[in-house]
Amino acid sequence: MFGADKGTADRLDGKKLHIGIVQARFNSGITNALAAACCAELLALGVQDKHIMQVQVPGALEIPVALQAMAERNHYDALIALGCIIRGQTYHFELVANESGAGVTRLALDYQIPIANAIITVENLEQAIARQSEKGADAARVAVEMANLLDALS
């Protein structure tokens, strides 16, 4: 299977950016890998370690409220949501996936702050493992690119 062509920005520069990360602890093996890949990519893009604030919440449904608290402080240039929702035998998967995603999007629009949504939704653990590193790094690139874009538009 071929991956989607995501395109790449010319040059991403995170040197002056402050980034907030909210990571769900549920499925921590996956979310820890997402966070590690995300932070490594932020550093590679020039974001200073001291300008990265990372917090953890119990699960994906709690991510939006922590993002909101960060957005209200008006200290961050971009935020990143990290989580992993694996389909189970109940409707709960759809509820958590839909509500966490809607919350992240609403906050980005309400606060006019870029939020890279790397709350991955998968059918099984194998899919989560296959996506964890790539999606974490993708989230970092999205956050830096969108922070720079919104700065240029203001």
Curated annotation (Swiss-Prot):
Organism phylogeny: Bacteria, Pseudomonadati, Pseudomonadota, Betaproteobacteria, Burkholderiales
Protein's organism: Verminephrobacter eiseniae (strain EF01-2)
Keyword Transferase: yes
Name this polypeptide is given: 6,7-dimethyl-8-ribityllumazine synthase
Keywords attached to this entry: Riboflavin biosynthesis, Transferase
Entry-linked Pfam families: DMRL_synthase
CDD domains registered for this protein in UniProt: Lumazine_synthase-I (cd09209)
Catalysis performed (reactions): (2S)-2-hydroxy-3-oxobutyl phosphate + 5-amino-6-(D-ribitylamino)uracil = 6,7-dimethyl-8-(1-D-ribityl)lumazine + phosphate + 2 H2O + H(+)
Pathways involved: Cofactor biosynthesis; riboflavin biosynthesis; riboflavin from 2-hydroxy-3-oxobutyl phosphate and 5-amino-6-(D-ribitylamino)uracil: step 1/2
Record: residues binding 5-amino-6-(D-ribitylamino)uracil: F26, A60, L61, E62, C84, I85, I86, N117
GO molecular function: 6,7-dimethyl-8-ribityllumazine synthase activity
